């Protein structure tokens, strides 16, 4: 029995102990379970957590609350961001409604464009520091029509608006009929240049230039990159000083035509003088302003370049201008004398005239420019003024002339007194121009002996005494030129050029630098060589030094000086008593292409000789006798 029990126990133990196969299968089973756990770790963890939640219901509740808080926080942040965006958009829309450039857009702009336009608008408002705008000039109790009539009545003129691009008359008041005798319908839509004097067109075009007005800015859309079209209606604009305009011009006057016989016009000069009366001098005062083309009722161009461009116009009041005639003042009331400033070339030609001269002489500045002052001097005062002309070219001091007569536009003479001084270029040491301050002298000042204006010590020399005739020869009577009033001499403008040539010759012979006309046409047309004879037939001796005559042009006696070619009787002004029409005819008769080429060749030889670049100069090719 005991042996049977031992066998049964050993058999059971063998059966219960794992064999090699069992160990392999057991190991494979264990590894398979591990792999399943690795592949299904998340599900296992979830199951474990579910088991844990089942085991702990309080933890499950906390997890649910945490997930709800996260979801609520996300929803609250989205709502906050949405409200912030809505508020910003509302502010952007409100800002766009306040900015005129944005409000005028036909489509909605992006935020960046709105902000850019707002910044530009703020800069514009900051720059508008001048409180005097157009709206401030008009009282509140006056309407626009009442104010217009009051201004026209006070100014005694007419209001007109002219486009700066083509000079088209956009508007003119009815009062233009009282001044120009044109109706309102006759002028509106016409070109202003058709009614201007031909010599004043360039001046008016210069005044219509709108380069100094406010520049127009082109806005670019940030999304499309294309220029933004603006249809902004400008508010009250500032009257900046650069936009103001004040000028004189001559306009046609529509006077009734009267049939005149041909005998009433003996010459063409008198016809031109009669035609000159059809123009009247208008003083225009106003400013430049810009309007949208749609507001003016004009046709807009559909071109892209013209988009957003405003129309620049000249708004001005035209008044009939009449020159001031000085009246004698009775009593002890002293007022400031009327004067004007002019600038002349060294030959006496006008290169600048102050606008005050129009009120005194009735000439427009553009009428005097390019003409010689000797054309307006009385023939009895030319001798004294020519001597002053020579002195001011030779000295740096101010020269005060005696009282002289100056011809004004209507043919009469006005008494003036001038102070002349020459301006010398500090670098080239050359006289560039002469500045003249001309003061009107009243009749009572001449009669009363005002110490400010010293009396003439002697009667002024006439032109004939300054320019004596040939030795023992009788004086010729000069023919009168139709259209030129008496008191002046035809060809007197030649005197200034001859004086300039004489002074240039003096400086050149002395070896000093010539005057500023060395580079001007005066030096080309004249300047005889140093060994050439003077107009009187005298020659400069070799080695001789010219002497400046002390008496100048006023002396009537001949002074022999072999070393100076232009002294008194042999002066360039004293040799020919008839320098008027005779010298002009001689100069015109000797002008030809061949003569001009020969003259230029001689001049180039002179320049090379002065610079030491050439040999002796041959004067045999000159077309005129020396």
From Swiss-Prot:
Chief place of localization: nucleus
Tissue specificity of this protein: Hair follicles (at protein level). Highly expressed in the adult brain, skeletal muscle and heart.
Domain PAS as annotated: residue spans: 143-215, 326-396
Spans annotated as Interaction with CIART: 508-588
Sites bearing N6-acetyllysine, chain numbering: 538
Activity regulation note: There is conflicting data about the effect of NAD cofactors on activity. PubMed:11441146 suggests that the redox state of the cell can modulate the transcriptional activity of the CLOCK-BMAL1 heterodimer; NADH and NADPH enhance the DNA-binding activity of the heterodimer. PubMed:23229515 reports that NADH and NADPH have no significant effect on DNA-binding activity of the CLOCK-BMAL1 heterodimer.
Source organism superkingdom: Eukaryota
Residue(s) carrying Phosphothreonine: 21
Impact noted for substituting residue 612 to E: Increased desensitization to CRY1, in the presence of CLOCK. Approximately 2-fold increase in CLOCK-BMAL1 transcriptional activity in the absence of CRY1
Region feature Disordered, mapped onto this chain: 1-60, 458-493, 511-595
Domain bHLH: 72-125
GO cellular component, one term: CLOCK-BMAL transcription complex
Site description Important for interaction with CLOCK, residues in chain: 125
Compositional bias segments (type: Basic and acidic residues): 51-60
UniProt-reported outcome of changing residue 90 to E: Phosphomimetic mutant with no effect on DNA binding or CLOCK-BMAL1 transcriptional activity
Motif (Nuclear export signal 2): 361-369
Alphabetized Pfam families for the sequence: HLH, PAS, PAS_11
Biased composition (Low complexity): 17-32, 511-521
InterPro entries given in the database record: bHLH_dom, Circadian_TF, HLH_DNA-bd_sf, Nuc_translocat, PAC, PAS, PAS-like_dom_sf, PAS_fold
Phosphoserine found at: 17, 78, 90
Gene Ontology molecular functions: aryl hydrocarbon receptor binding; DNA binding; DNA-binding transcription factor activity, RNA polymerase II-specific; DNA-binding transcription factor binding; E-box binding; Hsp90 protein binding; protein dimerization activity; RNA polymerase II cis-regulatory region sequence-specific DNA binding
Cross-link Glycyl lysine isopeptide (Lys-Gly) (interchain with G-Cter in SUMO2 and SUMO3): where in chain: 252
Post-translational modification: Ubiquitinated, leading to its proteasomal degradation. Deubiquitinated by USP9X.
Other facts: CLOCK-BMAL1 double mutations within the PAS domains result in synergistic desensitization to high levels of CRY on repression of CLOCK-BMAL1 transcriptional activity of PER1 and, disrupt circadian rhythmicity.
Protein name, entry field: Basic helix-loop-helix ARNT-like protein 1
Gene label: BMAL1
